[in-house]
Structure formats: C-alpha cells, structure tokens
C-alpha cells in the first residue's frame, strides 16, 4: 500500500509541473547544387550540454534518415557516408545551439532537416 500512495503523491506533485523540450530549427532555404547553407537548432527544456545531438532528414518519398551526430562536448562527430567531407556538425553549449554546415550541396540533399536529441 505504501508504494501505491507514493505514486499518488508523486502524480500530484508532477501535475503542476510543465516541462517541454523544444528544438527549433532555422536557416533553411533553397540553394543551388554546389552551394552552401547553415542550419541552426535552438534547444530548451533539457540540459543541452549533457546531451548528444543529431541531425536527421526526410526527403520527398523517402523515409527518415539519420545524417550526423555530435557528442555532448563536441569532441566526437559522426556522419552518414553520403555527406562525409561535405557537411559539418557543431554545437555551442553556451548558447544551447546545434549547427549543420552543408557545403557542396547535391540534389539528393534536398529534404526537411530535423534537429534530434
């Protein structure tokens, strides 16, 4: 019975607490093949500096594809093969921001890009 009462108490406390994770992307636009574009993502509602972060994309008629990831402190980065040496992921923990620099864009890079925790 004590366990059940603990849950009721916890639910009562959390009912008034509102915590919303927000990831807001910006910087998109149409760019000719060969051009460059920098995407930004402003994060809030969680401890950004403790979280590994990623970019994913959804091209028309295709599934969601992971593009790139960066460790919590920026020391490790990873890329899908198709964007290696063209895209650069980076972060600024002091600004709670994630970035994706897209260089030498190709037609197949046209997609909706998402910032992913």
Curated annotation (Swiss-Prot):
> Residue span of the signal peptide, if any?
1-19
Q: Where is this region: Complementarity-determining-2?
A: 70-77
- TM ranges are none
A single MF term (Gene Ontology): antigen binding
Write out the ranges of the annotated region (Complementarity-determining-1).
Answer: 45-52
Chain residue ranges for the region called Framework-3: 78-115
User: What are the start and end residues of every segment in region (Framework-2)?
Assistant: 53-69
Segments of this protein annotated with the region Complementarity-determining-3: 116-117
Annotated Ig-like domain ranges read 21-117
Domain of life of the organism in this record? Eukaryota
Q: Where is the protein found, in the record's own terms?
A: Secreted; Cell membrane
- Disulphide-bridged cysteine pairs: 41-115
Q: Which GO terms describe its cellular component?
A: extracellular region; immunoglobulin complex; plasma membrane
Keyword annotations for this protein, in alphabetical order, are:
Adaptive immunity, Cell membrane, Disulfide bond, Glycoprotein, Immunity, Immunoglobulin, Immunoglobulin domain, Membrane, Secreted, Signal
Glycosylated where? 73
* Gene Ontology BP annotations: immunoglobulin mediated immune response
Q: Which InterPro entries match?
A: Ig-like_dom (IPR007110), Ig-like_dom_sf (IPR036179), Ig-like_fold (IPR013783), Ig_V-set (IPR013106), IgHV (IPR050199)
Q: Summarize the protein's role.
A: Probable non-functional open reading frame (ORF) of V region of the variable domain of immunoglobulin heavy chains. Non-functional ORF generally cannot participate in the synthesis of a productive immunoglobulin chain due to altered V-(D)-J or switch recombination and/or splicing site (at mRNA level) and/or conserved amino acid change (protein level). Immunoglobulins, also known as antibodies, are membrane-bound or secreted glycoproteins produced by B lymphocytes.
What is the protein name stated in its UniProt record?
Probable non-functional immunoglobulin heavy variable 3-16
Instruction: Quote the gene name from the UniProt entry.
Output: IGHV3-16
């Amino acid at each position: 019975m004590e366990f059940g009462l603990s849950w009721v108490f916890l639910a009562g406390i959390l009912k008034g607490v509102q915590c919303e994770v927000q990831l807001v992307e910006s910087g998109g636009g149409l760019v000719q093949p060969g051009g460059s574009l920098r995407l930004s993502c402003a994060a809030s509602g969680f401890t950004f500096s403790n979280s590994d972060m990623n970019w994913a994309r959804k091209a028309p008629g295709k599934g969601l594809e992971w593009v790139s990831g960066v460790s919590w402190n920026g020391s490790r980065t990873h890329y899908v093969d198709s964007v290696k040496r063209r895209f650069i992921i980076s972060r600024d923990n002091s600004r709670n921001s994630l970035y994706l620099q897209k260089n030498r864009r190709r037609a197949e890079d046209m997609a909706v890009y998402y910032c992913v925790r």
